[in-house]
Amino acid sequence: MAIIHRATITPTMGELLDAWLDSQPWCPDGAVEMLGSYRFDDPAGQVGVEGLVARRSGRLLHVPLTYRDAPLEGGESFLISTMQHSALGERWVYDATGDPVGVRCFVRALRGEQEQAGMELWDGDTLVGRREPTARVYAEPSSPGIAPSAGVAVVAADGIELRLTRVIGTQLNGERQLVAEWADGRGVVAALA
């Protein structure tokens, strides 16, 4: 179960995302519209793993993130930003393609070994409710695709190849694919080759 705290976050997720997306060659300029998000549970309960679905200048984007309470050793090139979280303190936000915990969550989901997490909303030490995710993800057999392009991050892990889309709509090939559905859309966000 993913725990969501009622908190003030600085910089805001929108500010953090804008700054990082501005530096990405696969992302156009413009305002970011958040369409949905989903989470996975880290089995060790230490790292937050979240996938964001957004639109910027008409392009659908998939942004997989991890949240840590300390820097990821060797992960400097994947650090997106740090942020102050009023309930949890300083957090390090990473591109999940460079975080072993995030990569393993996606691999398990693609293999059918891990479902997306439910979300509990906490105010301090009090559980105040549950929140439905704004995007649903599920694994299914893959349909034929084409080779990865600039809109795809390719990660080699444990003898397999994980492909995470950056730009939703980019075709992927692989044995299994992870599909995200949100209020007005659907797209493949990952594949296992």
Task: Report each predicted region and the residues it spans.
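N-terminal domain-onset segments
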Residues: 1-40, 77-79, 94, 102-103, ...
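Short beta-strand segments
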Residues: 5, 59-63
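Generic detector of ordered, mature protein regions
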Residues: 22, 30, 48-53, 73-78, ...
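Short, structured protein-protein interaction patches enriched in aromatics and acidic/basic residues
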Residues: 27-60, 126-134
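Contiguous mid-protein beta-loop-alpha structural module that forms a pocket-lining wall or clamp
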Residues: 48, 57, 65-71
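Internal, well-folded beta-alpha domain core
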Residues: 66-193
